[in-house]
Amino acid sequence: MKYDLVVIGGGPGGLAAAIEARNNGVEKILVIERDKELGGILQQCIHNGFGLHEFKEELTGPEYAERFIKKLYELNIEYKLDTMVLEVSPEKIIHAINTKDGYMMIEAKAVVLAMGCRERTRGAIAIPGERPSGIFTAGTAQRFINMEGYMVGKKVLILGSGDIGLIMARRMTLEGAEVKAVVELMPFSGGLARNIAQCLNDYDIPLYLSHTVVDIKGKERLEKVVIAKVDENRRPIPGTEIEYDCDTLLLSVGLIPENDISRKTGIGMDRRTNGPVVNEMMETSIPGIFACGNVVHVHDLVDFVSAESRRAGAAAAKYVKDEVKAGEYKNIKNGFGITYTVPQKFRVENVENNLEVFMRVNNIYKNMRLQVKDGDKVIVNLKKPHLAPGEMEKVIIPNKILQSITGNEIVIELVGGDE
């Protein structure tokens, strides 16, 4: 089997990349999805809040996915469901398997990786205590309730204040459960401010910052959860314990980009994002293999995933048509206050209008300036009244400014203000 482009993942990232590649003249495209339907995680996100940037209207997750799925059908783009990709070779040969076709070897001129991300589990955070039933990741509980029609519990405690945890606090409340509290290890929430307002404050659900779970009690089913305040080293403070009677503990303790295939292929990874190192075209360290969406870094909004994936799809089309320009790479370095940047490097020759750089900060900051520097010269200077790790930031660097860069790297950092 031979294709011009193979997209691995039929979620919002994969769909947007495939559609954009077709719009840019790529004929033979195949989308491979391991679930039984297209749309990815959106199919279980039945709440609203999607599409405000992309469609200028508020949609639910399935409605947002449906618009892209319909477009895929209209453009007659081929796809395979219930299909597991086993590996991708550096020569862009995809090994995949399903029950209908059996084992397949698919040759591609270009590949887009759009596998999304997965949740961290109890094992990844080493919570002490017994191992009864009733402990779920927030996303698993979301799928059970919204898609499978099962109620996971009646008295619930949520560890972690990521967006999925906040949304599930509201969802469980609406389904009749009593949400005792949301508990967060860090001194700040990992979720969007609007989700804290709409999911916790509106339903009087308490949020305990700088707290964590220190014990889990229960034989067959979860019976009690003990939380405690933590010090600046994130160690529990004796004497601050609070015990809750509950039958369910939901974990919203972070998302990890799903990069098992990327690592197997030998793609260069960034330990800060847990995703591939990409350039201005969302191309990885292996020419012709592109990556987009949550497989690169975890996004706040699906609208941003769609926009980034379109860039990857258009770039893959350029690669297939042999229109990529050669050039010297310039690196993007993280300065004070910046956890990571995406892309990590760029070639001016392939930036048509602007270079969009996405980043997260490492703490809560107020009244700062976000600066981009070429050596000692400040080339972009933005006022930022409020910055938080839970909200992704973006800097747009115009092509004209990029052309004037003299060094082989630019530095993005925070300057001045209050921490």
List the predicted regions and their residue ranges.
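A Rossmann-like FAD-binding core segment of flavoenzymes
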Residues: 67, 72-89, 94-96, 173-260, ...
